[in-house]
Amino acid sequence: MKQLKTYHVFFLLAFAAPNLCSAQNISKDLINIHTLVDSINLSLGNNYIFPDKARMIATHLRSQAKKGAYNSFSTDPHKLASQVQADIYSIHRDPHMVVGYNPGWQGHQKGYTGPTEEEARWFAKFVKDNNFMFKKVELLPGNIGYLPFNIFVEHVKDAKPIIASALGFLANSSAIIIDLRENTGGEPEMVSQLESYFFKEKTLLNVIINRSNKDTAFYYADPAKTDGLTLSMPMYILTSKKTFSGGEDFTYGMQQAKRATIVGEVTGGGAHPTNPFSVGQGFLVQIPFARSSNPVTKTDWEGTGVIPDIKVESSKALIKAQELIFRERQAMAKTEEEKQKMEYLINGLHVNKDLGTLPVDEFDKFLGTYGPLNIYREGNKLFCNISGNISELAHISKNLFVLDGNAQIEFIKDDKGVYSMAKLLTSHGGLFEELRK
């Protein structure tokens, strides 16, 4: 089945080549409001995925134009575009529908306007210069793979070696976190390519139904596309309110296939692939021309967003996902040493996160000698001297501190409420107890 090609706001508006949208190109001619409204209505009527909504929008825009609601913007195309979009949203809010002004497109024929050869070359160079939007790959403590990814670009063939290198680096991770908190969308072909690395068998994850030409595209996670690289470890996806469109496509497909746990905020709620349509006089309308249908739910995330399995503020999602991974591994651990190792890693996530720095007078409760450990204070800082090796303690929570890069120390009260013992937990899961002298 023929694939659907979509060009998103990311390419055409947010990152348009400078020569396409410079201020010098703005026309000083008066905008013909009624002609513009008629052209917008025609494009919506012919292409919008929901014809009934297109008719409602058209009625409202004609009414607004007839009342003269746009007359004051006839010399300010950017404000006019914003007002028309606001009026569209007052009738039906589709986050993918965007009205913009870009005089660099004036020479294009009305209707669907794919990029020119010059624009396509510019976009291709842009994404290549930005490493196809792969900025970093990282191995976090506890052998957790971490890959932040902000845009699904269309250049799958060119990007494939980069994807394979990034995921190959994480192939021995015990779990993987894909961070889509800043992902605003992109191309379904790239979504499908990335999904393919996480399935052992060909799996249908999304169907896109096109109103314009009645075409339907089926998007599979297909291990045949990955040259033998398959990652089977537990997977966590981080989301935020900014996660949108293609980012939601990836998240929703993985969630419904039960391949990933979603951690973070409800996503933006845009499920409709779009194309840009020139409506004359330098104006463009990004029109959703198709809809997604998940093979499991038979619906999509339009308007509702993707609901996380674990809801948490986006700023806390990375730590939460790591904690979930460690808790799961701790519950499955067969030895006390492995359980303690996971506890060490969990504690390390919360250094200076829970209570911050304790008041100085609180430090004094811990001062003293515990076996070879001499705990003392200098000003508002707490230190440990072990045979001349001095470390500043970093607070985790209440009576728990980081001793150094390989150990944590917890002060334990006796039945009289006095801190009389120090427990040392090492990064390898070792546990040692020292009584206070």
Show the residue positions of the predicted features.
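Bacterial Sec-dependent N-terminal signal peptides
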Residues: M1-S27
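Peripheral terminal and inter-domain segments
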Residues: I26, T335-K437
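Terminal peptide-recognition signature
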Residues: I40, I88, L147, I178, ...
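Extended, small/polar residue-biased N-terminal targeting/export presequences
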Residues: P51-L140
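STAS-typified acidic loop motif
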Residues: F134-K160, V296
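Short acidic catalytic loops
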Residues: L147-P148, S173-G185
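A short, well-ordered alpha-helical element
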Residues: H155-S174
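Gly/Ser/Thr-rich loop/hinge elements
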Residues: G185-L238, H272-S278, F289-P295, D300, ...
